[in-house]
């Protein structure tokens, strides 16, 4: 286990976290690294592009079929994908029943006890980040993931989620070794997105590791259940993911203890960048619109 780097990709649902992480890990394996992916998102889509398949059976689903986790063997839950990347999905309960984070806790314990972490250079956790509840915070809380990479964009809710995740990291940074490795901006083509991402990273005492430009080739690859690295290895977008992988690979020991900001500070930052309008601006726009309508009548 010495030399093992345990990283985690956090981010709000729908931000492109699983796509970004799988493309980055596919690029990382090309750097000669042995990788284990542990999917910690109830959607169980953290390994699909690596396996070139539909979502794999999850630890919780298989445990329910067999009776309990103790009845499972490692080969039941571990699948081998692109260039021998090992893949596991923890899964979650049926919607509205139980805690989705429970699958994360159960899976990580099972994998550790059964030797899944042996002979790998990286363990990567792909974690839902809209809420940093006990279960989803488990890779942070139990000092499993030492480097957290937050996938975000210039959209307000993505920024809000990134700040929330930073709060979760801060909570456990002093009791364990967890650090914020940096922010990854998955471009949504919003106003001043790069500037805003760099500004938030600075406010969080971190850095923007990479700005991933938007490219339709990502969707083309996804439709074929492939990463861009596999589908179009010579494309410009594949080069972006390789650059991101190299930055993460060279970022060992560079993580920081984050300094999250308040909701008011986040809103002020958006106002400074002209992303959010003040009440006065909105009122003035409304009055101008009403005046225009009155003239037209």
From Swiss-Prot:
Chain residues that bind [4Fe-4S] cluster: 99, 133
Modifications after synthesis and translation: The reversible ADP-ribosylation of Arg-102 inactivates the nitrogenase reductase and regulates nitrogenase activity.
Cofactors required: [4Fe-4S] cluster
Co-factor binding details: Binds 1 [4Fe-4S] cluster per dimer.
Keywords attached to this entry: 4Fe-4S, ADP-ribosylation, ATP-binding, Iron, Iron-sulfur, Metal-binding, Nitrogen fixation, Nucleotide-binding, Oxidoreductase
Described function: The key enzymatic reactions in nitrogen fixation are catalyzed by the nitrogenase complex, which has 2 components: the iron protein and the molybdenum-iron protein.
Protein family according to the UniProt entry: Belongs to the NifH/BchL/ChlL family.
Protein name: Nitrogenase iron protein
Gene this chain is encoded by: nifH
């Amino acid at each position: 286990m010495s030399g093992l780097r345990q990283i985690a990709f956090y981010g709000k649902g729908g931000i492109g976290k699983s796509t970004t992480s799988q493309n980055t890990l596919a690029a990382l394996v090309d750097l000669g690294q042995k990788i284990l992916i542990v999917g910690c998102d109830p959607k169980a889509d953290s390994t699909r592009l690596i396996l070139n398949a539909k979502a794999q059976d999850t630890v919780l689903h298989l445990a329910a079929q067999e009776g309990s986790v103790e009845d499972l063997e490692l080969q039941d839950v571990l699948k081998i994908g692109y260039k021998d990347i090992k893949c596991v999905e923890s899964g979650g309960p049926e919607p509205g029943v139980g805690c989705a984070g429970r699958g994360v806790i159960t899976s990580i314990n099972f994998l550790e006890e059964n030797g899944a972490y042996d002979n790998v250079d990286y363990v990567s956790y792909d974690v839902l980040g809209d809420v940093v509840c006990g279960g989803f915070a488990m890779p942070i809380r139990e000092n499993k993931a030492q480097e957290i990479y937050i996938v975000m964009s210039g959209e307000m809710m993505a920024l809000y989620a990134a700040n929330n995740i930073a709060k979760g990291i801060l909570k456990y940074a002093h009791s364990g070794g967890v650090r914020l490795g940096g922010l990854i901006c998955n471009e949504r083509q919003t106003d001043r997105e790069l500037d805003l991402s760099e500004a938030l990273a600075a406010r969080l005492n971190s850095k923007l590791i990479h700005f991933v430009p938007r490219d339709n080739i990502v969707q083309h690859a996804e439709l074929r259940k492939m990463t861009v690295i596999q589908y179009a290895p010579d494309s410009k977008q594949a080069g972006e993911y390789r650059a991101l992988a190299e930055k993460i690979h060279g970022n060992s020991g560079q993580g920081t203890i984050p300094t999250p900001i308040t909701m008011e500070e986040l809103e002020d930052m958006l106002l400074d960048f002209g992303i959010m309008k003040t009440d006065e601006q909105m009122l003035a726009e409304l009055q101008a619109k009403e005046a225009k309508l009155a003239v037209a009548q």
